[in-house]
Amino acid sequence: MIGRHKHCIALEDFSREEILEVIDLAASMKEVLQRPIKKVPSLRGKMVVNLFFEASTRTRSSFETAAKILSADALNWTSSSSSVTKGETLVDTAKNLEAMRPDVLVIRHSAGGAPRLVAEHVGCSVVSAGDGAHEHPSQGLLDCFTLREKLGTLEGKTVAIVGDVSHSRVARSDLHAFPKLGAKVRLCGPPTMMPAGVERLGATVHTDLREAVDGADAVIMLRIQHERIGDPLIPGTREYSKVWGLNAKKAADWLKPSCVILHPGPINRGVELSPEVADGPRSVILDQVQNGVAVRMAILYLLAGGAGEEARA
């Protein structure tokens, strides 16, 4: 359990204390990643099934790595090689996999709400690895962990989220999590890529990049979610990059010296971020990847029965 939760589906459901429970444990889990032998017996005998209906590099390999470091058995399942291609429904697929007695189902799906639907029909814990444009809770948690690690705290800090906010599940999870930890959130991007009603969550909305990043402690750059967009919402990527992309000159002129830059990946280099910025000293993008393993170790440990036992990490 994570606090009162059997599942990890949306950070909208999580309290400040529940978010801190995960990232505090992730700090301990990260220590395991620094060891010569990256293996602990915490989840020996447990099974984690990764159920991915969308392409993924970082998230799926991160969950698989997290499970294996904790000594759990990890099964990777993809829709292209399954009975889904023969017309099997999502719920039937999940029920059949649950019959194999996994402890955790990790699911990524193009439809918002798919993980919650699965959770209503299975008895094991369910973790959302991203559902449509709804949420990506483990990414939100690793962003919280990375920012706390780099900034010391999120309390009183300002985080700018820039790009295709409307179609970004990462932005939604971040937007639900950051204010609970005391951070102020600024959203910036084209008006056509800005969701309605975000002000009720405490965020301010900007269309001018310079204004949005002025004085910010961290900037999270988002790619354009072409796979979720029907009609074009911007004139073109070149024009987008000129207005909302972050290059070395803008970073040097507009960002304060201590500001760090994050990106959930994959990066469209030369569009939202120039290579010089993505690979520069402000970038903590690869730290996010490493922290993602630690955070997912914490999630699996708490949901698969590690809570209440002696953590042997």
From Swiss-Prot:
UniProt keyword annotation of Transferase present: yes
GO biological process terms, semicolon-separated: 'de novo' pyrimidine nucleobase biosynthetic process; 'de novo' UMP biosynthetic process; amino acid metabolic process
Residues the record lists as binding carbamoyl phosphate: R58, T59, R108, H136, Q139, G265, P266
Enzyme class: transferase
Domain of life: Bacteria
Catalytic function, reaction form: carbamoyl phosphate + L-aspartate = N-carbamoyl-L-aspartate + phosphate + H(+)
GO CC field: cytosol
Binding site for L-aspartate: K86, R169, R223
Pathway named in the protein's UniProt entry: Pyrimidine metabolism; UMP biosynthesis via de novo pathway; (S)-dihydroorotate from bicarbonate: step 2/3
Gene3D superfamilies reported in the protein's UniProt record: Aspartate/ornithine carbamoyltransferase
PROSITE patterns per record: CARBAMOYLTRANSFERASE
Transferase as UniProt keyword: yes
Family label: Belongs to the aspartate/ornithine carbamoyltransferase superfamily. ATCase family.
Subunit record text: Heterododecamer (2C3:3R2) of six catalytic PyrB chains organized as two trimers (C3), and six regulatory PyrI chains organized as three dimers (R2).
Function noted in UniProt: Catalyzes the condensation of carbamoyl phosphate and aspartate to form carbamoyl aspartate and inorganic phosphate, the committed step in the de novo pyrimidine nucleotide biosynthesis pathway.
The protein's name: Aspartate carbamoyltransferase catalytic subunit
Name of the gene: pyrB
